[in-house]
């Protein structure tokens, strides 16, 4: 209960929101990986939805459709469900991560549409890829409090 209260207080104060959950461990590879991944609402994407693969999250909220693209091919692409497990001693949210969908590669030429679960304060939808060093990187898909756009932010397991 205390950890949930702390997380709610951090949210209320705007601390840690969209500044990069887990950014204390970020390095140049993680930042480069994140800069090559892109997410936006389907209505804002320049893609033909009929030509895209669609992944539906459990308990999907039909209007919440995101498009994930990348500027390079990423191995071991996953769409993941995120559930807040705890807040670390440093104040970072730590998530349980459950793989919902796996694909050998997220190809730069093949956008994927995700019909997302409804998100509240913390992201409940995410993606995972393997970076150039072979490490798995997990990113939450969050809604910006400023303009309603979608953001990717690395999360901790």
Question: What do the predicted segments below correspond to?
Answer:
Residues 32-33, 124-125, 131-157:
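C-terminal partner/receptor-binding element of secreted or periplasmic proteins
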Residues 24-28:
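Boundary at the C-terminal end of the N-terminal hydrophobic targeting segment
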Residues 1-9:
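Bacterial N-terminal signal peptides that target proteins for export
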């Amino acid at each position: 209960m205390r950890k949930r209260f702390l997380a709610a207080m951090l949210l209320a104060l705007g601390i840690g929101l969209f500044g990069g959950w887990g950014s204390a461990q970020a390095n140049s590879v993680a930042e480069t990986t994140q800069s090559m991944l892109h997410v936006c609402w389907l209505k804002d994407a320049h893609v033909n939805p009929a030509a895209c693969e669609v992944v539906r999250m459990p308990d999907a909220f039909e209007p919440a459709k995101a498009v994930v693209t990348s500027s390079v091919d990423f191995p071991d692409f996953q769409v993941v469900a995120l559930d807040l497990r705890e807040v670390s001693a440093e104040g970072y949210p730590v998530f349980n991560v459950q793989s919902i969908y796996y694909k050998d590669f997220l190809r730069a030429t093949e956008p994927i549409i995700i019909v997302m679960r409804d998100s509240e304060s913390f992201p409940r939808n995410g993606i995972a890829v393997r970076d150039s060093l072979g490490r798995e990187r997990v990113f939450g898909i969050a809604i910006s409090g400023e303009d309603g756009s979608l953001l990717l932010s690395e999360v901790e397991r």
